[in-house]
Curated annotation (Swiss-Prot):
It is a multi-pass membrane protein. Its main location: mitochondrion. The keyword Transport applies. It is found in: Mitochondrion inner membrane. Its cofactor is heme b. CDD domains: cytochrome_b_C, Cytochrome_b_N. A ubiquinone binds at H193. The lineage of its organism: Eukaryota, Metazoa, Chordata, Craniata, Vertebrata. Component of the ubiquinol-cytochrome c reductase complex (complex III or cytochrome b-c1 complex) that is part of the mitochondrial respiratory chain. The b-c1 complex mediates electron transfer from ubiquinol to cytochrome c. Contributes to the generation of a proton gradient across the mitochondrial membrane that is then used for ATP synthesis. Binds 2 heme b groups non-covalently. GO terms for molecular function: metal ion binding; ubiquinol-cytochrome-c reductase activity. This is Cytochrome b.
Amino acid sequence: MPHQQILMLFGLVPVATNISTWWNFGSMLLTCSVLQVLTGFFLAVHYTANINLAFSSIIHITRDVPYGWLMQNLHAIGASMFFICIYIHIARGLYYGSYLNKETWLSGTTLLIMLMATAFFGYVLPWGQMSFWAATVITNLLTAIPYLGNTMTTWLWGGFAINDPTLTRFFALHFILPFGIISLSSLHIMLLHEEGSSNPLGTNSDIDKIPFHPYHTYKDLLMLTMMTMLLLMIVSFFPDIFNDPDNFSKANPLVTPQHMKPEWYFLFAYGILRSIPNKLGGALALTMSIMILLTVPFTHTSKMRSMMFRPFMQLTFWTFTATFLVITWTATKPVEPPFTTISQVAALMYFLFFIFNPIMGWMENKIMKYN
């Protein structure tokens, strides 16, 4: 066994002394994934993937299964926690230049895509009104693909409309994808330890490192305790805070909800999709809103890794963060002025961040007189 793997086995991996709390979200994500797999298994034991019984089986789990309400709420709110952690994790990677560890960043972006797919399939399973219509709207975007679109949509649905075969295959995919996520997470962690994690200064920390255990394990445990407390508080006192009222009604293909809305963690992508008044253009923008993260390591031009000493880039980054929140907010509103205009401007600003990133780096190099 190589020396590095032996160190990893005993938690003795050398880590920079100056990594901050923003580096704790990796271990929090690992905890979230374990929680999701465990609660998901116990829910799958009682769930029935049939359009006539799915909604009733969720009610049965909540009312009749011992601690079923706890499992169901932990799984649903745990998914929201997962996305809160992953968005902060990505933001930290963008701010501190962690994306320059290319293999780790690319595997992480692939993980995000897999996670979003898993969450989408999971949202359809209760077969509530919003579950059904969200599935209809999002899968229907495949028809925008020239030549192959209609065939692919029919193949995905298992028929000419969303029906029992669709629910069955979505359940199968929702069950199998987390195992792929766990495998890729292991690869993500191994690739990270090939080079070692970055630090807030963005400098080489080889001269100042400490063992991961006990120093950073206790630091991680503090944040894990806080996250667990927050999760249990929401589960106990505000279990429906992230739920859509429409999803408490059984799916009815004959009644369209007044306002179509996916889960809150997809709203930024949905807002970008809605901001473009063209089906194919919207579908491409939706895909690019995630895929554009893959370009970041290849467009970095600054001689400095972290944004800590780059005030212009800091302003750009926090504008990007505000834009993300604005798109999320506009996606909850009806498709009418002024919300359409706001979402279009915000969507443009979202993509401009990734264009400004290399330009600002080049300008900073000129100002600092780097060759």
